[in-house]
From Swiss-Prot:
Catalytic activity: N(6)-[(R)-S(8)-aminomethyldihydrolipoyl]-L-lysyl-[protein] + (6S)-5,6,7,8-tetrahydrofolate = N(6)-[(R)-dihydrolipoyl]-L-lysyl-[protein] + (6R)-5,10-methylene-5,6,7,8-tetrahydrofolate + NH4(+)
GO biological process: glycine catabolic process; glycine metabolic process; one-carbon metabolic process
Signal peptide extent: none
One Pfam family per UniProt: GCV_T_C
Name of the protein described by the UniProt record: Aminomethyltransferase, mitochondrial
Keyword Mitochondrion annotated: yes
InterPro entries registered for this protein in UniProt: GCS_T, GCST_C, GCV_T_N, GcvT/YgfZ/DmdA, GcvT/YgfZ_C, TrmE/GcvT_dom1
UniProt source species: Saccharomyces cerevisiae (strain ATCC 204508 / S288c)
NCBIfam families for this protein: gcvT, PRK00389.1
Protein task: The glycine cleavage system (glycine decarboxylase complex) catalyzes the degradation of glycine.
Amino acid sequence: MSIIKKIVFKRFNSTLKKTALHDLHVSLGGTMVPYAGYSMPVLYKGQTHIESHNWTRTNAGLFDVSHMLQSKLSGPHSVKFLQRVTPTDFNALPVGSGTLSVLLNPQGGVVDDTIITKENDDNEFYIVTNAGCAERDTEFFHDELQNGSTLDCQWKIIEGRSLLALQGPKAKDVLEPLLSKTAPGKDLKELFFGQRHEFALKDGSLVQIARGGYTGEDGFEISIANEKAVEFAEQLLANPVMKPIGLAARDSLRLEAGMCLYGHELDESITPVEAALNWVISKSRRDLVDQKYWFNGYAKIMDQLNNKTYSKVRVGFKYLKKGPAARNGVKIFLPDAETEVGLVTSGSASPTLNNINIGQAYVQKGYHKKGTKLLVQVRNKFYPIELAKMPLVPTHYYKQ
């Protein structure tokens, strides 16, 4: 049975935006739903949710992620700006490398999670943020730049470009034949996880390719001009190991990989420490005496990190018995079925783990250790779960 039936979307709105691939999705039998202000495919005709999920894990899947906000930060003080609004050390980031980070409000809460890549030695950074946060992120960047009016840097949205994600163990085999062998640029075997470089297609068109993604598999995210996006997608899909994949599988894939979804695992009330994202807080930025080098929410975040003053932590879990999946907002209890100790943020059956139910949650400090057995309450019944280390399935990133 397809588990897509468990996913609920808002009523379709005729004012939704469309990506450059919208008509292609429809022609491929995509079931279009509203998502983050866009009309996006959740499934494709002839593929169940589980089939799409498993295909990506074993072959290659094409995801349209053009709804994501692509932007650029430039100027002599770009690094200083990033050092204030994120806890990550961008002084140490090599050219052509990117990293996951978080945008922080003054209280240390997560405004959005983001991938930020250093494009060159001229302090230019490529930034990808969530579509559902686009309006708030735009206000955030503008407000923070005004607050730092002495900083010489500019932020602007990149217009006219699509973003395609190729994910799965055979993604490289599909992409490589479409790239020019004569134009200057790195070979894909020299592009490692987290890196992004410019490549040329066989027709001479330039694309920016980053190695990574949102599934836990090896893969690529390709920024390409809108007018070239459909032709490029069709060329990718001409390979029989590549199939179009929708939002349903994208969500279950990221859940297995232990990745956050903004609005579920992350929001402005959650700090990176509570979200178990300590690794985005660079060690070089943890013991700063001079406050002029502090990032937003520094005092609170460092207190949580050093003194464990947080009250809850993001965790992964697996069901110990069959039952309905625990969705966002489901309560978590101690084995006595009386003491509430947490809330589920995301949950689904896991196709990779023989469809056992898995999820992520926030659990009170002291009950958050791997192996802890708790209960979730679904439809007035209790089901036993065990907290598990994330990712919940092995990842296969292409690293040096």
